[in-house]
Amino acid sequence: MAKQKIRIRLKAFDHTILDQSAEKIVETAKTTGAKVAGPVPLPTEKDVVTILRSPHKYKDSREQFEIRTHKRLIDIISPSPKTVDALMRLDLPAGVDIEIKL
């Protein structure tokens, strides 16, 4: 697996869980001897939904809700088979979405 790079992209609604997960991944990769670049914070997506407060009329009275999607990027440079095995066994919280590209 020489000259390879693993790119891990994390997404979550809660930034604290996201940062903890990123720290676990970085710690695991460093203990197995791989070089790590990151975690790099990517731009936060903000999704805003506007709805009417009233079910029938009063168009001027509206309410807005938003949900923010926080993202982080981690590059693992020249990973060993031991690194890949350790990352596969890593237990992360349920609220974190992980995309791995080799």
UniProtKB/Swiss-Prot annotation:
UniProt key word Ribosomal protein: yes
Keyword Ribosomal protein in annotation: yes
SMART domains: Ribosomal_S10 (SM01403)
InterPro entries: Ribosomal_uS10, Ribosomal_uS10_CS, Ribosomal_uS10_dom, Ribosomal_uS10_dom_sf
GO molecular function term, any single one: tRNA binding
Keywords: Ribonucleoprotein, Ribosomal protein
Any one GO biological process: translation
Pfam families, per database record: Ribosomal_S10
Gene Ontology CC terms: ribonucleoprotein complex; ribosome
SUPFAM superfamilies to which the protein is assigned, alphabetical: Ribosomal protein S10 (SSF54999)
Subunit structure: Part of the 30S ribosomal subunit.
The family this protein is said to belong to: Belongs to the universal ribosomal protein uS10 family.
Biological function: Involved in the binding of tRNA to the ribosomes.
Protein name from the UniProt record: Small ribosomal subunit protein uS10
Species name: Clostridium acetobutylicum (strain ATCC 824 / DSM 792 / JCM 1419 / IAM 19013 / LMG 5710 / NBRC 13948 / NRRL B-527 / VKM B-1787 / 2291 / W)
Gene: rpsJ
